[in-house]
Amino acid sequence: AGEDHGRGPYVQADLAYAYEHITHDYPEQTGTKKDKISTVSDYFRNIRTHSIHPRVSVGYDFGGWRIAADYARYRKWNDNKYSVDIKELENKNQNKRDLKTENQENGTFHAVSSLGLSAVYDFKLNDKFKPYIGARVAYGHVRHSIDSTKKTTKFLTSSYGGLNPTVYTEENTQNAHHQSNSIRRVGLGVIAGVGFDITPKLTLDTGYRYHYWGRLENTRFKTHEASLGVRYRF
């Protein structure tokens, strides 16, 4: 917009809705790493969550191409899960043996920050609407932790003589898995959206971006984001 065809530095503020997909690879209970048995359930191996976060950008508009640096912080995800299962092992002569299995899991995941650099091309359909596409490279900081405990208790319930049943604990075992990482990695993404010029200097922007943060040791993280914001050109 304008006689200079939109050239000049600009700032942009967005509010983004992000779909976050986190995949963890923990030791399996069989195979070459069976000496490092993980009690982590599938619930914490494959996390899908959502968050809303702000994003700010500073860039330069060349009249068709735009280059911008952006910064965003994401909401911390945390959850816990407790489950218990009782399995009957034996029942004869008024004596019953059961195995009680308890699982307690606590997990957190936080995309602490993302600092990106993007190159975007605007398609000028008319004086107001400008669809765009682009690519983005970003330096991301991610933290995640898991604390998982599996406890088994074998107990005997005796009803001999018709009296009130008596419960005897026979055996206890406990396995635990603890892990905490703070990782930084460079990832790649794509950008698309539409800009609407409210004034020659002010643009309403609605956009989508996909970003693959890369394999962060035993974790893979990717986000799909839809955003709405305003861009002001100086």
Curated annotation (Swiss-Prot):
Localization of this protein:
Cell outer membrane
What keywords were assigned to this record? Cell outer membrane, Membrane, Signal, Transmembrane, Transmembrane beta strand
Q: Which GO terms describe its cellular component?
A: cell outer membrane
Here the disulfide bonds are none
One of the record's GO molecular function terms: porin activity
Q: Would you indicate the residue range of the signal peptide? A: 1
Offer one Pfam family short name for this entry.
Answer: Opacity
Reading the lineage from the top rank, the first entry is: Bacteria
Q: What does this protein do?
A: Implicated in a number of adherence functions. OPA proteins are implicated in pathogenesis and are subject to phase variation.
Similarity comment text for this entry: Belongs to the opacity porin family.
Quote the protein name from its UniProt record. Answer: Opacity protein opA55
